[in-house]
Amino acid sequence: MPRRPSGGGGGAGPAAAAVRKVPLRKLLRAASVACGVQFGWALQLSLLTPYVQELGIPHAFASLVWLCGPLSGLLVQPLVGHLSDRIAPAASPLGRRRPFIAAGAASIAAAVLTVGFSADLGRIFGDSITPGSTRLGAIIVYLVGFWLLDVGNNATQGPCRAFLADLTENDPRRTRIANAYFSLFMALGNILGYATGAYSGWYKIFPFTVTPSCSISCANLKSAFLLDIIILVVTTCITVASVQEPQSLGSDEADHPSTEQEAFLWELFGSFRYFTLPVWMVLIVTALTWIGWFPFILFDTDWMGREIYRGSPDDPSITQSYHDGVRMGSFGLMLNSVLLGFTSIVLEKLCRKWGAGLVWGVSNILMALCFVAMLVITYVAKNMDYPPSGVPPTGIVIASLVVFTILGAPLAITYSIPYAMAASRVENLGLGQGLAMGILNLAIVIPQVIVSLGSGPWDQLFGGGNAPAFAVAAAASFIGGLVAILGLPRARIASRRRGHR
């Protein structure tokens, strides 16, 4: 529960804390694991919704598979953050956060191997390799791997953001810079991951991935995940070896005995009653933002394959068109990540000039306009005459790629500002940064559960496409933008003196 800050004397006072300020280059290295994690996340976002439909799960139920992510994140990230808060820095050679970062990365590596080889393992369990058949064994293996992958993602990113908050000592400016570094590495991981997903020749480099139960598209997925493991191992090692964690946590955390056994969920949900209005506004805007983002995350490449390229993973006669659309969608997401990276670089200047709340609100309104544009493109494409080859008109493809690209700017803001605002606003409440990130995570995963449960029925109710989910996304994004502009501070956030804790 929150604790009143104490003055604490001695040599480890404010002056000493200022001397021990972590250089920005070390913060940059500490954030590098985001590249490895996001490389796999990009593959997951661009390729796994189409892949699970190839295994036999209908489009209407594909979103339910993604329940694994928010349900695991609902407890895993707050629990990991809580546990890492409770570890004394000197109790582990790697400190408080880095053991969880390393363990989460190991879980991701095991998960992508499981997902990548799910078709082969399903064949061992008796699946048929007849085209169009439902592969129950592969689906079960896939779901286990998918669940483990989301557990690993949550177990890695939460402690990493808390690690950065520890290193910046909750200085608002340095915290925003650290989170911008994190977003920059996420952008780099996205660019590499989506470029990997857009390339169709990985099976030629890893020929052993093609098997009787794993076609060329499956082998490309498998090969991409093997590359993911290599990048993940390298970036995790860089982060873990980047900098020693602070040994002095301040009196508010040092006074907390490691033997105290408060019930985790009680502390998590009990902390809500201490939240001030600005904290609640951050959580509300975060929730609305993710109601906007999650339909796009679920169906971006599927939308390109179905609505733009008029393909389907279920119909062998148009499966190739679907895969062409998925690869074009991956290319669009790569362009999205380029703009995401550029926005991450200039984000600190934007926040200093206009204020974090206004920047966040404007980005949400831009999101809403992009989702409306996707609805317009869907309607136009549906009513156009395509050439006999079935290739969509160039103008439609370019318009789709432009929308995908523009969405990179608000995505960079979503990956940075909410975490920086939460980290700076919970300090006065006396909450550990790990628990703070876990609480913010609740505002992310609960909307994802709502969208995962609702998007399938919405789509079926209105004809089986992706348009209804995007309409909900546009409305939620617009409302979130208005709330951010009206309810979050618009003044520039000045850098605080380090003279108190």
Curated annotation (Swiss-Prot):
Listed GO MF terms? sucrose:proton symporter activity
Q: Which GO terms describe its cellular component?
A: plasma membrane; vacuole
Q: Which InterPro entries match?
A: MFS (IPR011701), MFS_trans_sf (IPR036259), Suc_symporter_pln (IPR005989)
A GO biological-process term = sucrose metabolic process
Q: What is this protein called?
A: Sucrose transport protein SUT2
- Its job: Responsible for the transport of sucrose into the cell, with the concomitant uptake of protons (symport system). May also transport other glucosides.
Tissue expression pattern: Expressed in source leaf blades.
Q: Does the keyword Transmembrane helix apply?
A: yes
Q: How does it assemble?
A: Homodimer.
Query: Member of which family?
Result: Belongs to the glycoside-pentoside-hexuronide (GPH) cation symporter transporter (TC 2.A.2.4) family.
| Record localization | Cell membrane
Keywords of this entry: Cell membrane, Membrane, Sugar transport, Symport, Transmembrane, Transmembrane helix, Transport
Q: Pathway it acts in?
A: Glycan biosynthesis; sucrose metabolism
User: How does this protein sit in the membrane?
Assistant: Multi-pass membrane protein
Cytoplasmic topology: which positions? 1-31, 77-98, 157-176, 244-278, 349-356, 416-433, 489-501
- Please name the SUPFAM superfamilies in this protein's record: MFS general substrate transporter
Outline which residue ranges sit on the Extracellular face: 53-55, 120-135, 198-222, 300-327, 378-394, 455-467
* Location (main, coarse): membrane
Task: Tell me where the transmembrane regions lie.
Answer: 32-52, 56-76, 99-119, 136-156, 177-197, 223-243, 279-299, 328-348, 357-377, 395-415, 434-454, 468-488
What gene is this protein translated from? Answer: SUT2
Paired cysteines (S-S): none
